[in-house]
Every structure is written in structure tokens, then in C-alpha cells.
Amino acid sequence: MQSNLIPHTHKHLSLLTIYRAPFGKFNKFLTQLEEILQTIRNLKLDFIICEDININHLNESSKRSQFDAVLMSYKLISTVTFPTRTENNSNSTTDNIFIYTFMFENYTVSPSIKRLSDHNVQMIIIHIPQRQLDVHLTCYNILLI
């Protein structure tokens, strides 16, 4: 698993990016993810997760259920409901953006046409009136060949 936490102190929002290889050890990934989420919770950071963990969110599966359960325990929800990758006439949503259910209620997620990658770009715009700012965050998952 590869992850980065990018603090954005001006708007008090951090971005956690996560990548899990398709054939990585899933249980180890879940353990590491929980450790990272617990650390972030202890630091009291507001954050968003952009991920490519190679679990198709369009289909029900054991891995998806386990992953979703971990995120739900931290009050994080999936926002991407459209395919993020199309290959051989098959659609999948292996990339996603997760946000806090209690903090970000007014948001828009939209796809953007792929230009640099085999995945489509997901863009999220979060409207936060109580803080008098809008957070614009674009999550790119780029495969370099």
C-alpha cells in the first residue's frame, strides 16, 4: 500500500491518497489503513481520502464490504457513483473519494475525461458555508507506462 497525507493548513483540510496494488495482501492493507485512520483521528485532522485500491465499488464483494466497514467506523462515506475506468466494454469504479458524513453534506462529484491515465478523473467540490469557503479538490490517479 502506498499512502500520502498532504496537509492543507490554509483551509484546514488534509488529503489522504491511497493506492493498493491489485494483488496486494488485502488483510495487511486493512490493518495498515486502520492504523493510518486512527493516527489521523488522534491528530484531529479534517481530511478527505482519494483512493485507487483496486476494489470495484460498482459490485458487491467481501473485500468491498470489509473496506466499507472500516471507513464507516470512521464515519467516512463513498462519493463516487459512476464508473472511473472502462476497459474492454467493462465498467468499474476502482477509484473513489471518501468524506466525513457529518462534516461535508453539500458536495458535488463529477467525472472528467481521462487524458493522462487509463482511469477517469474524479472531481469533488465541497461547499462549506459555515467556514465561508469552498474547497475544490481534484483527485488524480495516474498510471505511467
Give a label for each model feature.
Residues 24, 84-89, 114-117:
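A short acidic, often aromatic-flanked loop/helix-cap motif at beta-alpha or helix-coil junctions
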Residues 1-4, 34-36, 82-85, 108-111:
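Eukaryotic intrinsically disordered and solvent-exposed regulatory patches
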Residues 20-22, 54-56, 103-104, 129-131:
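Short, solvent-exposed loop/turn segments at secondary-structure junctions
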Residues 29-102:
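Metal-dependent phosphoesterases centered on the DNase I-like endonuclease/exonuclease/phosphatase
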Residues 28-31, 60-63, 110-112, 136-139:
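Short coil/turn segments at secondary-structure boundaries
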Residues 18, 50, 79, 125-127:
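Structured beta-strand/turn binding interfaces of compact recognition modules in eukaryotic regulators
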Residues 3, 10-23, 48-50:
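Active-site-proximal beta-strand elements of phosphoester/diester hydrolases
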